[in-house]
A protein has these predicted regions:
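Catalytic NTP-binding/metal-coordinating core of nucleotidyl cyclase/transferase enzymes
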Residues: 1-73, 79-80
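Catalytic beta-strand-to-alpha-helix segment of the class III nucleotidyl cyclase homology domain
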Residues: 39-42, 61-114
Length: 114
């Protein structure tokens, strides 16, 4: 049996609140807003030495070497999204939930499990 490679890692999971409802209202506008939010979020994750290893529609999962870095990235991107939402009409303000977890993970190629 192949030996499993493990390491201690901090995982940040972000998800857009009520994304399906926004898609029901206007798919194209929602996708434009999502892309704009990702243009804010992705560089901030990179700035704090995070690595996005999974995305699915309206979610982003990133790995960080440090819990402090992941929290700082989450705070900065939430503040940036809040600032962005000041100029967006109320019915299309995308809000993001963020969870952070520190644990032993299993590494398989570029993906992480656990």
């Amino acid at each position: 049996m192949k030996k499993v490679k493990r390491k201690l890692s901090t995982i940040l999971a972000a998800d857009c609140v009520d994304f399906s409802s926004f898609m029901d209202k206007d798919e194209e506008l929602t996708l434009d807003h999502l892309k704009f939010c990702r243009s804010i979020i992705d560089p901030i994750i990179d700035k704090y030495e995070g690595r996005i290893f999974y995305t699915a529609g309206d979610s982003v999962i990133a790995e960080f070497k440090s819990p402090v870095s992941s929290v700082n990235a989450a705070i900065e991107f939430q503040k940036s999204i809040l600032e962005r939402n000041k100029s967006i009409r109320n019915d299309f303000k995308l809000v993001w939930r963020v969870g952070i977890h520190l644990d032993d993970v299993i590494i398989e190629g570029d993906n992480i499990f656990g």
